[in-house]
Curated annotation (Swiss-Prot):
Cystine crosslinks: none
Keyword field contains Ion transport: no
Signals that turn on the gene: Expressed in the late phase of the viral replicative cycle.
Organism: Monkeypox virus
Name of the featured protein: Core protein OPG114
GO CC list: virion component
Subunit structure, as described in the record: Part of a complex composed of the kinase OPG054, OPG092, OPG100, OPG114, OPG115, OPG142 and OPG157.
Lineage, uppermost ranks: Viruses, Varidnaviria, Bamfordvirae, Nucleocytoviricota, Pokkesviricetes
Role: Late protein which is part of a large complex required for early virion morphogenesis. This complex participates in the formation of virosomes and the incorporation of virosomal contents into nascent immature virions.
Length: 146
């Protein structure tokens, strides 16, 4: 009996950041999640935090700095240059992000950046939490069923 295993195919499959059922279940149990998205809005990475993003202790700004770390135009638009990024407890890759982001500038760019930021905060559980944490299930179901 011969088993034909293509190591390159298996390696490519594992490197393509597949969302496994265990990862999905873990996300649905997490309370504070921040989604990083492609330019078309598809989630690419779910960053898990152990504490809530808050305005009073400025953690929401630190999370935003981490979220837009690779997009200096957005950091400049949102006045986050002097803020230290807050690293997540854990990050789970959902899909591959190989797209370029458009350069954002001016009032329209600021509105787009804020819209992206406010749509990033998600929760996997149904406990009472601040209004800016939206349910995660819709985004995850869209990714899994594609």
């Amino acid at each position: 009996m011969s088993i034909n295993i293509d190591i390159k195919k298996i390696t490519d499959l594992l490197n393509s950041s597949i969302l496994f059922p265990d990862d999905l279940q873990e996300l649905l149990r997490e309370k504070y999640i921040v989604l990083e998205r492609k330019s078309n809005g598809t989630p690419t990475v779910a960053h898990i935090y152990k504490t809530m993003a808050r305005f009073d202790n400025k953690s929401i700004y630190r999370i935003a700095k981490f979220l837009f770390m690779n997009r200096p135009d957005v950091i400049k638009l949102l006045f986050l240059e002097d803020v230290e990024p807050l690293l997540p407890y854990k990050s789970i890759n959902i899909s591959i992000n190989n797209t370029e982001y458009p350069q954002l500038e001016g009032p329209i760019g600021t509105k787009i950046a804020l819209l992206e930021l406010f749509n990033a905060f998600r929760t996997g559980i149904s406990e009472p939490i601040p209004y800016y944490y939206l349910p995660l299930r819709k985004d995850i179901n869209n990714i899994v069923t594609k």
